[in-house]
């Protein structure tokens, strides 16, 4: 797995994990805002790395590989792990691995594991997979119907279409199957990490089950509503607010 590093001279380390259907350069707007004060680790996740012909494995496997890479490179403490959507699921599993000390774990619109019968989760994963395959085939014209075009430009949607065309069928299937069904330990270990769950004002209804899950499973979670945004919009549409929220973690 390729890990891109910025601001290596800084002491505080932040791990930034991108969502699905984008590349690591999802963070290109916020990197200049953060690299003066933080050492940034930005992985190019398998299946979404244009420089590495690989397939997505699973949320759990990627979290294990990230923990292994961080430890092997001599880093003993992470100031914050931030993950958006799929990246939030990986961020949590990195934290639960407890291989390194992590001060903050931030999940932005993270999708929690479905609490549904196995066969139902198969149908949901299949629906998501087919939607992405249709988007890959239809390109921008179909993606414009699937996204709120007031929030995302035609160039943004072209970017998503290009990423989808790069992704293998295996990557697309595993992404949705794993994000919907990754395994959080039944008995959560005691954590010294502060857990944060951020979600956009425009997705509050869609995240209701996820919010309830976090309250039940991780009662210490600090919740933050992101005003006037939709899912995964913070980094792309309000990078200055993102940097400000990182600075305020304490």
Protein language model regions, located:
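Flexible "cap/lid" loop of the alpha/beta hydrolase fold
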Residues: 96, 102-132
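Gly/Ala-rich beta-loop-alpha elbow adjacent to hydrolase catalytic centers
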Residues: 83-87, 91
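Conserved HGGG/HGGXW glycine-rich cap/lid loop of the alpha/beta-hydrolase fold
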Residues: 4-52
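Conserved alpha/beta-hydrolase catalytic His-Asp/Glu region
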Residues: 116-118, 136-189
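Active-site loop/oxyanion-hole signature of alpha/beta-hydrolase fold enzymes
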Residues: 41-80
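Short beta-strand/loop motif that positions the catalytic acidic residue
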Residues: 191, 197-199
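Acidic catalytic loop of the alpha/beta-hydrolase fold
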Residues: 201-206, 232
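Catalytic histidine-centered segment of alpha/beta-hydrolase-like enzymes
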Residues: 226-239
């Amino acid at each position: 797995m390729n890990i891109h590093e910025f601001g290596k001279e800084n002491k505080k380390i932040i791990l930034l994990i991108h969502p699905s259907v984008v590349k690591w350069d999802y963070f290109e707007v916020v990197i200049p805002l953060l690299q003066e004060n933080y050492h940034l680790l930005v992985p190019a996740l398998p299946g979404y790395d244009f420089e590495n012909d690989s397939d997505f494995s699973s949320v759990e496997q990627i979290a294990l590989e990230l923990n292994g890479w961080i430890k092997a490179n001599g880093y003993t403490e992470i100031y914050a792990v931030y993950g958006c959507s799929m990246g939030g699921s990986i961020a949590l599993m990195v934290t639960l691995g407890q291989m390194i000390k992590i001060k903050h774990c931030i999940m932005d619109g993270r999708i929690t594991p479905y609490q549904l019968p196995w066969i139902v989760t198969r149908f949901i994963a299949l629906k998501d997979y087919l939607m992405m395959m249709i988007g890959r085939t239809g390109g921008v014209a179909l993606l414009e119907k699937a996204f709120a075009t007031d929030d995302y430009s035609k160039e943004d949607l072209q970017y998503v279409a290009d990423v989808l065309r790069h992704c293998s069928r295996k990557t697309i299937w595993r992404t949705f199957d794993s994000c919907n069904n990754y395994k959080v330990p039944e008995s959560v270990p005691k954590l010294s990490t502060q857990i944060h769950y951020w979600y956009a004002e425009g997705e509050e209804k869609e995240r209701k089950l996820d919010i309830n899950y976090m309250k039940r499973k991780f009662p210490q979670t600090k919740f933050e509503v992101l005003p006037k945004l939709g899912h995964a919009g913070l980094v792309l549409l309000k990078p200055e607010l993102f940097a400000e929220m990182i600075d305020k973690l304490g």
